[in-house]
């Protein structure tokens, strides 16, 4: 879950500090909330196929209930090593059979919901993560692998690549001559595109579901990775930073919805319509007491925007398509309330 969509009403229960045990420390969080439908329809809802079949089928007008759980474990024998498990379940409120469905993330993470009508089957996601912080080396690596339409660990072990996605990244700090100043180098790869065998055979993709056709959204916006279903993103970050400031460059390459691309164009064997964005920008922040100001400027070059690449007879196969340039500016201001707990935490640091 990310901040790609606007917020929604929810209840959150979480540990305020790690729970110590003989084998290490545990932390956890449970969330339950209501997801709403989009208030907007596609631009063209009357188009038909063969003058008989409507291409647009309205979504079900019903609210959805989302429940999720995250558990983190840090073994006491390895400093800086963390393991995590996350599970999310969403279903229509009208399909909830009893009060237990409101706690689905706690009760059915390992249950396949066998015997349930397919039209009432929930949309489920699960992931395992690992993060390792090397304090002396001022570096960390992290990985999270997830399954869309999670059907239990047996199915995961049999076909782990089916409906799978992952995030892999690392960050490293290098000391600069000036005390408490660092050069930060980071790289991250996000892969949500499915293997072509599965995406073509099942018309399936991350964040999409045949029963809950709204997908993993709130008001039509993805509440998962902002790149959306079927997409891949590679990011490189190079920045100068200290305790109060950060300024640096960012490079990105995004492949838009490869699952849709193969579904729409594979039968034509037209491999020259990939929609790819290349971005370069400057980002940073400054901290002034309890006030934080963040900003980013990005220049985005879109190749074959919206998968459009028209060629006239005689034109070379590889050539300019619907290529566009876009500038993106982002500015945010955050004020941290000087709570007593936060002041005590800062004194302890």
Q: Which residues are covered by each model-predicted region?
A:
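Exposed, low-structure sequence patches enriched in small/polar residues
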Residues: 74-349
